[in-house]
């Protein structure tokens, strides 16, 4: 930590010439173009150096010592510093994160400092932005257990929901995210000073909500799930969020939970979410397959491509549409036969079953 003196140009006492390109490019000096004046960005603030994961200083954060605004001020984004891709305290916390088996994300630098002073050195802070998808990627590389601690007021809950939304596309099976909300009158700094390390960690481990629980709690808030309208509203709001999740197991379980909440079969839910097409049973047809056929070069080329696609992805059979004017012979008849066989069952057969079915036929 350090201190930026009060005054407009304290850096001029240290750096000459003042200003210079390095000071302006790294954001330490601001140019007022209207008055053509230069002045220091950080004035009368406690200073926190921000390091990258290699320990190099890439920016600064400053906290006021009085009631001035903004309370926290960060270096602007520069070629070296991107707030959405860096976390305060990560370099210093890396060993403690490994030892604890978890990483804690808070909102302010002073929270990180206070927690470390009271024996919780595995905390990091976002840099004046909401937690981004890039932050989530970084956090998941550090630990399988990621805890977020937010103030219990409306602003804290809004920040928590933004963090959850940005986390959804990055989620991986085997990684767990948890959300702890402190009493409205506390932030992590004041809470640990009032209650100590043991009570803070007890709350962190036993009172935090896993992402899956917080997700449904937040989406269901204010909805009457005893009514069809409430259930449909939940479906509408949950669907685009669930679509962002690429973690197979977690995504499946969350959709299963949605089916339970709205009281429908998971298979029907999959259709509602647009993930499956209802099976279409088609009566088997028999097409003539003469050994000598009139050739239709363009259609035959397309038919051959579609046959290869069906053998690789049988579920695509529902998309096969042959115009009425096409003569069903040769490759087009083969395509029609294969598509009808695939659609005749409740689930698409694999390509081995397709080969076996047509083994001794002209198809």
Language-model region placement:
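Phosphate-handling DNA/RNA-contact segment within nucleic-acid enzymes
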Residues: 7-142, 146, 159-160
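A charged alpha-helical hairpin associated with nucleic-acid processing machineries
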Residues: 52-53, 94-103, 130-146, 150-363
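Conserved alpha/beta enzyme-core scaffolds, especially Rossmann-like or related mixed alpha/beta domains
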Residues: 1-5
């Amino acid at each position: 930590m350090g201190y930026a003196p009060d005054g407009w140009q304290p850096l001029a006492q240290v750096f000459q010439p003042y200003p210079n390109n390095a000071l302006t490019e790294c954001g330490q000096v601001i140019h007022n173009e209207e008055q053509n004046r230069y002045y220091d960005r950080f004035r009368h603030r406690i200073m926190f150096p921000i390091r990258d994961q290699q320990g190099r200083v890439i920016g600064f954060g400053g906290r006021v010592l009085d009631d001035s605004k903004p309370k926290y001020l960060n270096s602007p984004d520069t070629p070296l510093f991107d707030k959405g891709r860096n976390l305060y305290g990560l370099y210093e916390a890396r060993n403690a994160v490994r030892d604890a088996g978890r990483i804690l994300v808070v909102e302010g630098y002073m929270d990180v400092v206070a927690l470390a002073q009271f024996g919780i050195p595995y905390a990091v802070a976002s840099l004046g932005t909401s937690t981004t998808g890039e932050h989530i990627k970084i956090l998941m590389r550090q630990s399988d257990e990621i805890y977020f601690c937010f103030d219990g007021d409306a602003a804290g809950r809004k920040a928590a929901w933004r963090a959850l939304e940005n986390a959804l596309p990055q989620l991986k099976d085997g990684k767990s995210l948890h959300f702890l909300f402190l009493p409205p009158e506390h932030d992590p700094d004041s809470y640990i000073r009032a209650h100590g390390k043991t009570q803070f960690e007890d709350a962190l481990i036993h009172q935090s909500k896993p992402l899956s629980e917080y997700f449904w709690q937040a989406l269901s808030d204010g909805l009457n799930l005893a009514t069809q309208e409430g259930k449909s509203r939940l479906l509408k709001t949950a669907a685009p969020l669930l679509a962002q999740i690429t973690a197979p197991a977690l995504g499946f379980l969350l959709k299963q939970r949605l089916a339970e909440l709205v009281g429908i079969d998971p298979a029907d839910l999959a259709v509602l979410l647009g993930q499956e097409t209802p099976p279409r049973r088609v009566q088997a047809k028999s097409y003539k397959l003469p050994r000598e056929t009139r050739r239709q070069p363009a259609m035959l080329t397309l038919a051959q491509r579609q046959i290869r696609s069906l053998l690789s992805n049988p579920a695509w059979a529902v998309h096969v549409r042959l115009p009425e004017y096409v003569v069903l012979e040769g490759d087009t008849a083969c395509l029609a036969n294969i598509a009808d066989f695939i659609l005749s069952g409740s689930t698409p057969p694999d390509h081995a079953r397709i080969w076996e079915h047509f083994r001794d036929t002209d198809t």
